[in-house]
């Protein structure tokens, strides 16, 4: 009985890791490249980010409860200057920008 519970836990863990790591390995996940400006409106944020060369801009909650304009871009392995491993980026968890890795 304990072996069955343990093996189902291992299978579930492996499935979750697969859903997390496969997009990271392939380099096809969207990351936040810049998240430092105060956000007044999403259309204004989007226009600013598009002007700076990012794909999109959104107002997101920051860890301290404020709202920041975050510029989103596609972190692709084809970009020579911004690989997912070497460039700093943020992780969004439930719409909150929480981690700079």
UniProtKB/Swiss-Prot annotation:
Q: Signal sequence: where? A: 1-27
Name the domain of life. Answer: Eukaryota
Keyword annotations for this protein, in alphabetical order, are: Antimicrobial, Disulfide bond, Fungicide, Plant defense, Secreted, Signal
Show the SUPFAM superfamilies listed in the entry.
Scorpion toxin-like (SSF57095)
Is Coiled coil among the key words of this record? no
Question: Which Cys pairs does UniProt list as disulfide-bonded?
Answer: 35-71, 39-59, 45-69, 49-70
Which Pfam family is one of those matched by this entry?
Defensin
Predominant localisation class: secreted
Task: Kindly list the places in or outside the cell where this protein is found, as annotated in its UniProt entry.
Answer: Secreted
Choose one Gene Ontology CC annotation of this protein and give it.
Answer: extracellular region
Q: Choose any GO biological process term that the UniProt entry carries and state it.
A: killing of cells of another organism
Similarity field: Belongs to the DEFL family.
Official protein name in the record: Putative defensin-like protein 86
Q: Tell me the gene name.
A: LCR82
């Amino acid at each position: 009985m304990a072996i069955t519970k343990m093996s189902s836990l291992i299978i579930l863990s492996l499935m979750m890791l697969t859903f997390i790591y496969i997009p990271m390995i392939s380099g096809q996940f969207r990351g936040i490249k810049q998240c430092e400006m105060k956000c007044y409106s999403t259309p204004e944020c989007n226009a600013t980010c598009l002007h700076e060369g990012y794909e999109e801009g959104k107002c997101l909650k920051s860890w301290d409860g404020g709202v920041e304009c975050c510029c989103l871009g596609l972190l692709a392995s084809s970009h020579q200057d911004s690989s997912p491993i070497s460039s700093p980026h943020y992780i969004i968890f439930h719409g909150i920008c929480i981690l700079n890795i």
